[in-house]
Amino acid sequence: MSRAAGVTLAASALVAAVLAVAAIPLDVLAHFAPVWLAAGLASVAAAAALRGAPLRRLSLACGALAIVAGGFLMAPELLRPPEPAAAPGAAGQIKLIQFNAYKRNGDVRRVADWLIAQDPDIVTLQEARHDLRDELLRRTGWSVAGAKEHVMIFSREPRLRMMRPPLRNSVLTYMNATYLGSAGPFEVVSTHFDWPTSRTFAQQHADLARVTAALPRERMIVTGDFNTTPWSDALRRTDLTLGLRRVDRALYSWPAQVGGRAWPLPVLPIDHVYVGKDWKVVSIERGPALGSDHYPVVVVLAPVWRR
């Protein structure tokens, strides 16, 4: 192996190690923990295979450090206990789809075809184009909350009400409505956060906690594109402050495409679903690529019946 190649490998491993270690105190880097972990694994594998490579020991050491740091960030999410599951035949189930449909996704009919075929009770959309809204309403009997916004909630049955909690100086983009389920009314809140580099990002997390605190939480469902990974301090704090349970666990939802071309492997779990104590999960899974840069998340919930 040439010296130049060995130096390049060592430099790549060093960069991965530095970024992985820096991600522990720097939350904006922590979101990319899977990237640092994968880079560390690749560096170690390459250095192990190329026994004569210059700076091989440095490559191995830096790669191992990136693996340890990335694993340290991701371990709490990967090792947390699974959600208590409801039986597949549990009564009163609802099916919900969470999806950032992507404002530049012109394949409206394909998205509508898939959503309608799923026969959901609730669909929460971010970056919802108005032609997609019109297509869904034309072909179904669904109702929509937030019809003029880019965050919309579609439902098989009309909503009972829409009580918007008053938020002063809020920077949160969200939609909420109340629906009637078999076990009683339930709240649905859907949101779309800015990127972690935005000045509004931290305030959006805090504002969402204010919304959930102002509404009944027992049968609440919160969904959205949070642009936040579960190995970040930002989402860990939100897990604690919402008063709900996040039912997705390392469910990778982004990217589905890059630069208009399909991307084979999602890297970051940034679409999330939270529920109140009176829901149990029947199933949760990632849907197919539909022309958006996000994959949909499909969750089936069953109510906990209280006497």
Regions found by a protein language model. Give the residues of each.
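Structural signal for the C-terminal ends of transmembrane alpha-helices
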Residues: V21, A45-P54, R159, W305
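N-terminal Sec-pathway targeting helices
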Residues: M1-V7, A47-C62, N227
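Membrane-embedded alpha-helical segments of integral membrane proteins
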Residues: A5-A49
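N-terminal signal-anchor transmembrane helix
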Residues: A49, L58-D113, A117, D134, ...
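Soluble catalytic domains of enzymes that build or remodel membrane lipids, polysaccharides, and related
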Residues: L96, Y102-I116, T124-R307
